[in-house]
């Protein structure tokens, strides 16, 4: 991507990371990117989400580069590039942008919010927002801005935390404003996009998440902040029989996209939409 062809509002640092000239506040823990960088390559959750996203892109391919908006440490961006889909990391967190550029060797990294970068209209072929929109209070305005920068019939790939009844302390700590279902996604996108595929995944985690996270939060007995050791266990970073079983179950979910099928339960929602003309 030739950044100067789509915006003039940037500076470039010694690592080659592009920075916008100003930066808005974001609803995300300041240490979040470094926290998850320690887990991503070992986590069955991040692995399965990546596999799901990749199958979505394969089935509904873009017609150009994918702008990975709010892409954190570039975990998804790196996988897309490795699989032959050109992608650019757009991440407002300094540590995430650095991890993506220096540690994951991504060719194009922009440290900015979408709003602050002020991209030109219809300058982007496709966009991905993977667990991003829930961090934005005025998500309707954000979706409008994404539609503005996308080319006609440009593809939008989304993952979002699903089912408001799964709301827990993890959502609060992570800076989420909401979780989503079919209706809320449709209402959010209908003005600018046509939804061409929607499904839920991580189905086998729905009941455990409710019993271990959502229910204790509702009862007021779970307010602790997550730590690396806790997350290593929850993300299966240390392996084990149960983790292997979960991986097998989750791998079967990936066939849903290959077969064009969908399901109505799961802790995360995947959406593929196309910009309206």
Predicted features along the sequence, with ranges:
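Short, glycine-/aromatic-enriched active-site segment of Class I SAM-dependent methyltransferases
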Residues: 37-39, 156-188, 212
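Residues lining the SAM
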Residues: 130-133, 159
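A short glycine-rich, Lys/Arg-flanked "PGG" loop and its adjoining helix->strand segment in the class I
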Residues: 140-155
């Amino acid at each position: 991507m030739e950044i100067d062809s789509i915006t003039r509002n940037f500076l470039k640092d010694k690592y080659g990371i592009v920075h916008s000239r100003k930066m808005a506040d974001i609803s995300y823990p300041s240490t979040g990117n470094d926290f998850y960088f320690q887990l991503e390559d070992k986590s069955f959750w991040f692995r399965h989400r990546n596999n799901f996203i990749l199958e979505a892109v394969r089935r509904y391919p873009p017609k150009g580069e994918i702008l990975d908006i709010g892409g954190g440490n570039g975990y998804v961006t790196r996988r897309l590039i490795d699989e032959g889909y050109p992608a650019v990391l757009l991440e407002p967190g300094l540590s995430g942008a650095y991890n993506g550029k220096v540690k994951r060797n991504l060719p194009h990294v922009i440290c900015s919010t979408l709003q602050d970068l002020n991209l030109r209209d219809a300058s982007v072929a496709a966009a991905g927002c993977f667990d991003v929109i829930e961090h934005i209070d005025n998500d309707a305005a954000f979706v409008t801005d994404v539609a503005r920068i996308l080319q006609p019939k440009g593809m939008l790939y989304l993952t979002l935390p699903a089912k408001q009844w799964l709301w827990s302390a993890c959502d609060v700590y992570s800076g989420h404003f909401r979780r989503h279902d079919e209706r809320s996604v449709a209402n959010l996108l209908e003005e600018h996009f046509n939804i061409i595929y929607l499904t839920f995944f991580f189905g086998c985690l729905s009941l455990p998440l409710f019993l271990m996270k959502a229910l204790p939060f509702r009862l007021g007995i779970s307010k602790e902040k997550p730590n690396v050791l806790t997350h290593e266990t929850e993300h299966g970073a240390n392996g084990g029989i149960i983790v292997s079983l979960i991986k097998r179950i989750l791998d079967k979910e990936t066939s849903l996209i290959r077969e064009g099928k969908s399901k109505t339960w799961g802790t995360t929602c995947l959406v593929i939409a196309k910009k309206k003309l």
